[in-house]
């Protein structure tokens, strides 16, 4: 689903996991002629701390974006009334 703001739902998962492939993340960025991308997802638990998988995926997205010329600006994790920026934490 593409939103008017340019936001797009890539995957809907379960309470504890979802599958995300960089190809799907960048598909709509490429089709939209985007030069940058902000990746965001939620943790239904409400804890916005990044998991090892969150960090690994974000690093893969950053590397993929560098290859195709679309900058990953940040990877955000939302929780209950809070969020975590992996860029701010220097994790990507």
What are these regions (language model features)?
Residues 11-92:
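Active-site-proximal loop/helix of nucleotide/amide-processing enzymes and allied scaffolds
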Residues 5-8:
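Hydrophobic structural segments
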């Amino acid at each position: 689903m593409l939103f008017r703001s340019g936001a797009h739902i890539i995957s809907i998962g379960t309470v504890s996991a979802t599958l995300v492939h960089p190809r799907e993340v960048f598909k709509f960025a490429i089709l939209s002629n985007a030069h940058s991308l902000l990746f965001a997802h939620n943790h239904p638990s409400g804890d916005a701390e990044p998991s090892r998988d969150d960090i690994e995926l974000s690093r893969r997205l950053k590397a993929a974006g560098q290859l195709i010329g679309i900058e990953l600006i940040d990877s955000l994790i939302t929780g209950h009334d809070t969020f975590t920026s992996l860029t701010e934490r220097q994790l990507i």
